[in-house]
């Protein structure tokens, strides 16, 4: 098994920033915007009556970060990955004003097994070396030299992940599948060669795969000579 360096975004990848953000703005300004109304990375387009300063104000308020909840299974999968011997690093583009509250009220509260030593603050995530990056923002994945896992969110549903060398993952079970596939690539190729007639049964019974699409994408990319 390959020991991997796994890079992980925070907002809307391991925790629900957008849900809390929309709720906060609705309550503060008497609005009724829904999470499903967010179709773009620029959240301001969903709040046309507010200024950008009003929209982004909650992010620099310490109390706001106490309302953020973790995404299901994110903690369990990341802890499992570390127990498997993989290195897990949080890579967040957070503003410096939010770091202390965000770390204390979100990351270290819900992911206590992750150390501050394993946190990178970076806006240009492509400059950080790793084997996998999991992120909901396509622009953070584009151009990076790693397996690119795009976490599905409302703002990226229309983005063509596969055309841009990315694998779309819908939840943390998909992420776990991808980690297994990358770490055990050679073993899986060999096993599939021996089970050409029933590859799906082999993957389900021997490796526990349920959603095979992320795995198939990674395998195809590796067979073609890379992950870009």
Describe each region flagged by the PLM.
Residues 65-69, 74-107:
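Substrate-recognition element of Asp-dependent hydrolases with the DxDx(T/V) motif
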Residues 118-145:
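Conserved Lys-Pro-Asp/Glu-containing loop-to-beta segment of HAD-superfamily phosphomonoesterases
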């Amino acid at each position: 098994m390959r020991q991997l360096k796994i890079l992980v975004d925070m907002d809307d990848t391991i925790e629900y920033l957008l849900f809390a953000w929309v709720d906060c703005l609705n309550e503060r300004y008497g609005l009724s915007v829904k999470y499903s109304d967010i179709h773009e990375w620029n959240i301001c387009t969903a709040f046309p009556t507010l200024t950008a300063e009003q929209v982004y104000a909650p992010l620099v308020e310490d109390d706001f970060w106490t309302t953020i909840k973790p995404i299901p299974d994110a903690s369990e999968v990341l802890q499992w990955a570390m127990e498997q011997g993989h290195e897990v690093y949080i890579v967040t583009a957070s503003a410096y004003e939010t770091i202390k509250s965000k770390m204390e009220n979100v990351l270290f509260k819900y992911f206590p097994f992750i150390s501050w030593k394993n946190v990178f603050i970076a806006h240009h995530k492509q400059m950080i070396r790793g084997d996998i990056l999991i992120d909901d923002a396509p622009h953070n994945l584009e151009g990076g030299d790693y397996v690119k896992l795009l976490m599905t969110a409302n703002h990226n549903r229309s983005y063509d992940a596969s055309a841009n060398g990315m694998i779309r993952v819908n939840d943390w079970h998909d992420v776990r599948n991808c980690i297994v596939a990358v770490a055990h690539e050679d073993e899986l190729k060999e096993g599939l060669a021996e089970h050409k007639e029933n590859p799906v049964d082999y993957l389900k019974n021997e490796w526990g795969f349920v959603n095979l699409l992320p795995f198939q994408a990674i395998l195809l990319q590796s067979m073609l000579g890379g992950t870009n």
